[in-house]
Amino acid sequence: MAEKILMREGRLIIPDRPVIPYIEGDGIGRDIWSVSQKVIDAAVKKAYAGQRSIQWREILAGEKAYELTGTSLPNETLEIIREHLVAIKGPLGTPIGKGHRSLNVALRQELDLYACVRPIRYFKGVPSPLKEPEKTDITIFRENTEDIYAGIEWEAGSDEVAKVISFLQDEMGVVNIRFPESSSIGIKPISEEGSKRLIRSAIEYALEHQLKMLTLVHKGNIQKFTEGGFRKWGYELAKEEFATELAEGTLVVNDIIADNFLQQILLAPENFQVVALTNLNGDYASDALAAQVGGIGISPGANINYQTGHAIFEATHGTAPDIAGKDLANPCSLLLSACMMLEYIGWKEAAVLIIQALEDAFINKNVTLDFAKILDVAHQSTSQFLEVLIDSI
């Protein structure tokens, strides 16, 4: 009988047949989810000889939710994730500059999924622009709930922005808004609590995985109290809570300016292991790093609250509506995110089977169209790629 995943005394309780909600996603979401579900089920069945299985429960968000319920993110979806703790999702679209709230950001904020975790590693056989892509093996911890993603901004010419600018000028003595009559204004909240819980999770991850280097990436040379605060609070936390590890040398904490970090991950990526960043810097850096190992089409991601146990594992790329329904999509981002999910619930053996199947496919140049064009080889359709993986498992 299927049961819910529970959190007790800070630990996940995983039944042999957990119920895991999924969001199919927009665009190519249906294409890549149907493949991913079959691969996950096959790996779990093989790894545990049929003694474990996942009962999938569809929940709605995005276009499908809007068509069926009139809203893109129904309250029921949020409640089901809260109740079941762990979920997985395909890509969700948000119109640019239309005033619509990003569904991805909404999920993270509504569920307080404060850590965006993106492990970036190279798989042999995947096309990369770097000569030595195998040197890139970095796990990103991006703060997920603060920074400019809080969505506190006002449009140029609005009554609201006029009030904000007037307050800044009249009450706060601000004189360096260059064009106040035509400026939009945004606010960037960065808190001690938000920074420390993210950095704490990054350090705990590093120690759990026998990685001793944690790097704080920031723009504190310009934004002294927000980005600079992130850096300051990170060092404070390390000294307060991990003094023994620092003294023993099992943990080393350092920091780097964000623009220099983007240079160094190209010049010397081997110098970084686990990296903690504020929200916007993390957004830039995670996709830049993904490009070094094959792109976001093969980049997994998870949004996690380590305190409550809630987690959503997701495809990190867009909806690619131009190839939706054409059997051309690359499911690797979602599959690797599924591997993260399996590891999160302690089913590492199943995750290993999927990763091994992907590694074999890449080495043998059994790849989808996006990689095939770069490698100049015949491509596998999405459904053919599924068959390759199932045969390997």
Regions found by a protein language model. Give the residues of each.
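Glycine-rich phosphate/nucleotide-binding loop
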Residues: 3-5, 63-66, 263-366
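Glycine-rich phosphate/diphosphate-binding loop of Rossmann-like nucleotide-binding domains
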Residues: 15-16, 21-37, 47, 163-256
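Buried hydrophobic positions in well-ordered alpha/beta secondary-structure cores of metabolic enzymes
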Residues: 26-29, 85, 141, 202, ...
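Buried hydrophobic packing segments
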Residues: 36, 40, 234, 334-342, ...
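N-terminal beta-loop-helix "entrance" segment that forms/cooperates
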Residues: 49-73
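Flexible, glycine/charged-enriched surface loops at secondary-structure junctions
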Residues: 49-55, 209-218, 243-254, 347-355, ...
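Active-site rim loops that border cofactor/substrate pockets in soluble metabolic enzymes
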Residues: 60-63, 226-275, 279, 283, ...
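N-terminal glycine-rich phosphate/adenylate-binding segment common to multiple enzyme folds
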Residues: 65-171, 184-185, 280-284
